[in-house]
Amino acid sequence: MKTLLRASLALALSLTAGVAAAATLTDDLGQQVELSHPARRIADAWYAHHSLLMTLGAGDLIVATVNHPADRPWMFKVQPSLNQALQARGKTFSSEALVARGVDAIFVPAQDPDAISYRQAAIPTLSMRFDDVASLKRSLLTTAQVVGTPQAQRRALAYNRYLDTQIAAVSAQTASLSEAQRPRVLHIQSLRPLKIDCSQTLIDSWIRLAGGRNAAAEVTGNMKEVSPEQVIVWDPDVIIIGAGAGSLEASPYAALFSGLKAVKQHRVLQNPSGVFPWDRYGTEVALQILWAAKQLHPQRFARLDLIAATRGFYQRFYDYPLRVDEAERILAGLPPISG
């Protein structure tokens, strides 16, 4: 952790010092990447990473995307320039198509096998990964270095301060909670098949920051397939259904899970979803922490106005004047009204 903090501090200092015409950057896997100039035409092969570029005010630099309007309607509404971007089929771009579009940097998720072909095409390729708050902040600073504008630098630092402030505000209310007062939360990423998010993930981080305990903490990693019998053994106090996973009532497990504590006490929640699902790997995790804290400890966060917080975030970091009704739909995990 100390090493990560030192690296983040070094990144922050380099950002405030200005951006050189050419630079050698270090991606999230520790690989050195040469950039001849600040990126102006970016391909993004990691679904979640788009929200980082948008937070930096650089969403309009994305000229190739793995996201699609049908899957991420809020993303394309808030950042309409994505409609003109090259849209990948699946997770893979043609290197030739990227070169033809003049792409000068591409972000890929860690362990993406296509990174090899992008590098062979001489496209600066940065492998990105974060699984907690500290590494998210580091990734944002690295992304700002790639963009290389004073605005991106300022916004990266501003977002990181904002995230720290939200965490501090929530922690002030939850720090005194005993272990017994922290509900056991099961986060279900998929109902068909049944997949959950466990420890050593960003999901586990926001559960704990919001004053909960991960019911699946004995398992590590994202989107782990489990048996319904294991869920019954865990018997969580709260179940959070990930955006796009459907409803528990309409799932094959409705009857089987009817005896769970969370179901009997009506504490099965649908997660909000905006530019990206709040519960996953994007900058809206700052809002997710607030939302989760209010769901887990409503009395302690009775005065927290989630609609106001959501609207303020979208205006500040996405430059989008979100209406009240739009914020309500995002909080309910609903897409924008078409038309």
Tell me the role of every PLM-derived stretch.
Residues T92-G102, A121, V226-D235:
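Short helices/loops that flank or line small-molecule/ion binding pockets
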Residues S205-W206, A217, M223-G246:
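Ligand-binding pocket segment of bilobal, Venus flytrap-like solute-binding proteins
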Residues D44-R101, A105-Q111:
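A short, structured surface patch at a secondary-structure boundary
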Residues M1-L9:
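Bacterial N-terminal signal peptides that target proteins for export
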Residues I196-N222:
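Alpha-helical, coiled-coil/dimerization segments enriched in small aliphatic residues
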